[in-house]
Amino acid sequence: MKIKLKICGMKFSENIQEIADLQPDFLGFIFYENSVRNYTENSIIYIPESIKKVGVFVNERHEKIIKTIQKYDLNIIQLHGNETESYCLELINQLNHNQLNTKIIKSFLVDDYFVFQTLNYYQMVDYFLFDTKGILPGGNGTKFNWEILEKYHLEKPYFL
């Protein structure tokens, strides 16, 4: 399995360019007003097509996600809140209705007591993301015990 690199929290043009020059696989832009890394520019500077643009959302309305995908030409969206199975299914319907071929990452906050059977309800998404359960939504600057991933037995690719 090839390891891929996703760098998230892109906000400033000069920083985006410097990181893009390093050719990561994915660049993440946060579209969550309560985040200090919320991306508010009118456009994203040129990024080579080989780098996929990821939009990160937290419990956002489908309509706003669709508009943001279209505005910034996002390749992937990351759902980093309490989005339910039915929320994800409806979002997929909206993406299809708008003829958007946008992939979906669904994040899960993991601690030593995470119930991996929960993932069975989210088979409709393209990827999972396992993040440390912390105070804030999104990255908290700490890692969880990766040994817990020995309990992961699905085929779906995931991010850490």
Feature annotation, model-predicted:
Residues 1-160:
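Conserved N-terminal beta1-alpha1 strand-loop-helix module at the mouth
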